[in-house]
Amino acid sequence: MNKKLFCASIYLYQGSAVRNLEDHTIVSDDPAALAAYYCNNNADRVIVFDQSNTDDEHEAALDIIKKIALACEVPVIGAGNVKRMEDIKKLLYAGCAKAVLNYSKLSNIEITEEVSKKFGKSKIVASYTDTSCLSEHKELLEEYISELICMN
């Protein structure tokens, strides 16, 4: 049976939680406290989007994701800045229950089988904005992806 969940989103940019992927207005300087607030207010999950631009920013974001995972009693889903299998590993080791592959990026589609076999289908999620990717990559999604996230 398909199930819909209330998933709160945190967009990390330069150490803060910002409004969304395009608007970097700061909504919280303490993303872990924001995540705890969401958890205490009936979120089924928290999705964290790492918007870092450099390796140093990415490592700092992973430290924040660790704090978020510790602050939450619900699963944390890690997304953003995935370029290779190592990035999925880092998200999972930071405490994320699952990691997201962005199906708007060919490089993420190309590593689907590899990361699913390495970490297990249950740990891998795909995000998409264009529904045509669902039919275009149907077999890959069914075999190697546990969940889908529609980004709109």
Predicted region positions:
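Glycine-rich phosphate-binding active-site loops on the catalytic face of alpha/beta enzymes
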Residues: 53, 89-111, 149-152
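Conserved phosphate/oxyanion-binding catalytic-loop motifs
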Residues: 78
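Short, well-ordered alpha-helices that flank and scaffold nucleotide-derived cofactor binding pockets
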Residues: 70, 93, 117
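C-terminal helical cap(s) of enzyme catalytic domains, especially alpha/beta-barrels
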Residues: 110-119
